[in-house]
Amino acid sequence: MDCFHYPLDTETLLRKKRKLRRELLARNPHPLHKKIAILGGSTTNEVADQLGLFLLQYGIEAEFYQSEYAQYWQDAMFGTPELDDFHPDVIYIHTNWRNLTALPTTADSEAAIDAMLDEQYAHFETMWQALEQKFACPVIQNNFDRPNFRLMGNRDIWDPHGRSNFISRLNQKFYAYAALHEHFYINDIDYLSADYGLTAWGDAFFWHMYKYAICLDAIPSLANSVANIIKSLYGRNKKALVLDLDNTLWGGIVGDDGVDGLAIGPEVPEGQVYAEFQSYCKALKSIGVILAVDSKNDEANALAGLNHPDGVLRPDDFVAIKANWDPKDLNLKAIASELNLGADSFVFADDNPAERAIVAAQVPGVAVPALDGAENYIKTLDHGGYFEVTALSKEDLKKTELYHQNAERAKAQAAFADYGQYLDSLEMTATIKGFDPLYIQRIAQLTNKSNQFNLTTLRCSEDDIRAMAGDRNDLCLCGKLVDKFGDNGIVTVVAGRQQGDALDLTLWLMSCRVLKRGMEDAMMDTVVAEAAARGVKTIVGHYYPTAKNAMVREFYAQYDFAKTAEDADGNTEWTLDVAAYTPKHPHMKIER
């Protein structure tokens, strides 16, 4: 649906929201269900409606609680039976500068202004702490947009008496809090309002007539921003950017114009535009976005273009390069298969609207933004929010390296007729241990990013993981896999709750990067051995179907679990007699 891509079609989003909701639900009949509490300092009805639409686009169906008008602080501090019973998964605090109860004047001393700043900050900090203590869920807080006038003109931003200066300092306090609290996220309306246009954003008509903090047409942009944070928290980010070459990464057609005739680099304005776009793509790679090429070109010409002396990207920046004359939708499907990623993990960037239309029609789930003018490429991708970062792990920083190592493994496999011999040749070592504090962030990230090899899709915060690790009744294991090509890092997580002589497995997931290497066998052998050492006689596993995890539907059957229950939705329960288990002894060394 093009209305959700930048630039947003606000008229369609606002006027046809019911129709859009029906279409989104029909397209995704098994969404992830989440409860979102909106605590507002202004009217929030349209905010909830638009946020619900954007989340549905990401496969998340939201149920909303909304505070009464301007009762955000009272609901947070004193509670309401409705909010308490709601048990939110996420809390969004929708406030702006109009909710400040004091602002400096030219008559105030600097000491009085500092005290005022501390008082305004404390108003919010005590609220955040109360919400954390009561609900222990992610909190998304707007920072502050700029006020509707600058009393002192340009001096307003640096003079302590200026409202602009005061709000900037207050925002900095919010950011310092966010840096220290893992469940706390800033929705940057200071940026959004500047990008939208501050005068239109803060149109006072909507405040005085309807008590909307921002103009009606800006609400979809606000909702998109909040939705990007939430979908990132629940593993719905895109993971890969697939790029065309000619007139996408450089100006011109390399097969016709030759490498010397391409527009790329500092010599001409057009070349500067494409160099800047390549720099942006390389920056995306640095935060864990994997890059690939899908271009109608001879491979030799494509590689020559990527080695242009004034280019920023090089062939080794990409995990896959499909430069041929095959249909681009088939190339993209091949890339997805090679990387073990679903099509909905990809963004496809191509200057040609015909190619975009074919890919969008033939590869459901892929995001296909409308690139219009090379000078707008960065803005279009950046405003799309496809790669919103809410956490950044060491594995993210070396994601391209990990995929290159996988390519080396695939090449090595071709030399073996026997798959077992190939696995032996990898010289793998699995390190399986409890939830080590060093890996808490990565474990939590895996629970929120892994969708395909994930039996229960239980999503956990870092605090959730710490709580499991500290409970003697919980069996918690994570696995790291190293081979001769490199270190894959933490790639699998298992957790279960022991009750008497039974162990109930609540979490089992694995990164698809290590599929078919025996890591799941190593984990199962270890789980059963650990369970037996604890006196467990029966292990119970669960499979909860989603749109993405069909590959593990019969996972437990492979290990001689017996299916003991199945409901109408396909949720299954499996049971193993520990004494009857036969270890798998995978092709790797296992260290504890």
Question: Can you say where each PLM-predicted feature lies in the sequence?
Answer:
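Extracellular glycan-modifying ectodomains
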Residues: M1-V242, L249-W250, G255-G261, A354, ...
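Short hydrophobic/aromatic-enriched beta-strand-loop microsegments
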Residues: E61-F64, D317-A320, G365-G373
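Basic, amphipathic juxtamembrane/active-site segments
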Residues: V254-S279, P364-L371
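Substrate-recognition element of Asp-dependent hydrolases with the DxDx(T/V) motif
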Residues: Q272, E276-N307, I321, V359, ...
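Conserved Lys-Pro-Asp/Glu-containing loop-to-beta segment of HAD-superfamily phosphomonoesterases
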Residues: L332-P353, V359
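Terminal substrate-recognition subdomain of acyl/acetyltransferases
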Residues: A360, P364-L426, A529-R592
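A conserved beta-strand-loop-helix scaffold within acyl/acetyltransferase catalytic domains
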Residues: T431-S511
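Acyl-donor binding region in acyl/amide transferases
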Residues: K484, I490-A565
